[in-house]
Design a protein with these regions (language model features):
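Acyltransferase
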Residues: 186-213, 244-250
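Charged, often glycine-rich, active-site loop that binds/positions anionic groups
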Residues: 55, 59, 221-234
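Acidic, glycine-rich active-site loops and adjacent beta-strand->loop/helix elements
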Residues: 2, 44-45, 95-99, 103-105, ...
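Gly/Ser-rich catalytic/binding loops embedded in alpha/beta enzyme cores
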Residues: 1-95, 195-199, 203-205
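Short acidic, glycine/serine/threonine-rich loops at helix termini
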Residues: 7-9, 49-53, 100-105, 122-123, ...
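A short helix-breaking turn/cap at a secondary-structure junction
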Residues: 112-192, 250-258
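Short helix-loop capping/hinge segments that flank enzyme active sites or metal/cofactor-binding pockets
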Residues: 1-13, 170-178, 229-266
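Glycine/threonine-rich beta-strand-loop-alpha-helix active-site module
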Residues: 95-121
Length: 266
């Protein structure tokens, strides 16, 4: 969930139901300077933990194409609002697919930038070594416009970098296509679209080469080790003392226990 000054920022959780953003996230400041008008916040899975936008204290988000289907998640509200035509663009956060998957489900464009190219200052963290803010729009061109405004080094984010692509100046580059990502489970339609892009890049003079990362098959298992561990550390701050709601109790331990029991989940 991304801070916008003066907006409630509940993270789709009872825990932060009354919490109001005290400042703008860096990406929000950048877009405001560019003239962007923010119209509201969207729904997501609680604290970005989910892939369907059904796990929210405020109810599920429906897919604009068919309300019987989910919009994906965790940034399902961000994808749905663009798909429905209620906004030209939105922002989401992507840890393990939370921008790209709902964008796919809703028929729009979602982009997870390279880690560090977009400041995470003002993002409520899920898994800090994986989280990245990115745009959701209707077209690749719109995605490029939003990304160009939010990318760049930010001293407020210790993981921020100066993106190397700013130095390319349309030079011919070498691009790798991962063999492991084009195997069983990928639809013919998806493979055909990737092949179209590969051919386009070759026509532009770029060196497009098939490459292999044999450990790719272990990626999901590793993700489920890293993400829950970092999530546990990040959610520990919501204890009824510093942030969020507070349940009354006779001891601090009991207070934290009651607060977290009421604040998290259903």
């Amino acid at each position: 969930y991304i801070y916008v000054y003066g907006y409630k920022t509940p993270c789709s959780s009872k825990m932060l139901s009354k919490y109001v953003s005290p400042y703008d996230a860096t990406v929000v400041s950048s877009l405001k300077k560019a003239g962007t008008i923010f119209t509201g916040k969207t729904n997501l899975d609680e604290f970005a933990m989910g892939s369907s936008t059904e796990n929210s204290a405020y109810g599920p988000t429906k897919n604009p194409w068919n309300p019987d289907f989910v919009p994906g998640g965790s940034s399902g509200g961000s994808a749905a609002v663009v798909s429905a035509g209620s906004a030209v663009a939105s922002l989401g956060s992507d840890t393990g697919g939370s921008i790209r998957q709902p964008a796919s489900f809703c028929g729009v464009v979602g982009f997870k930038p390279t880690y560090g190219t977009v400041s995470r200052y003002g993002l409520i963290a899920f898994a800090s070594s994986l989280d990245q803010i990115g745009p959701i729009t209707n077209t690749v061109d719109d995605t490029r416009i939003i990304f160009n405004e939010i990318q760049g080094y930010d001293s407020k984010d210790a993981t921020s970098i100066t993106p190397e692509f700013t130095k390319l100046d349309n030079k011919k580059i070498k691009i790798g296509i991962l063999k492991e990502l084009m195997q069983e489970g990928v639809s013919n339609e998806s493979q055909n679209e990737v092949n179209k892009v590969v051919n386009l890049l070759k026509e532009k003079g770029h060196d497009v080469t098939e490459m292999s990362l044999p450990l790719t098959e272990m990626a999901l298992s590793v993700y489920y080790l890293i993400a829950p561990a970092e999530c546990s550390a990040n959610l520990s701050r919501f204890d009824g003392v510093r942030y969020g709601i507070r349940e009354e109790a006779s001891t601090s331990y009991e207070m934290m226990n009651k607060t977290r029991s009421v604040g998290f989940g259903e």
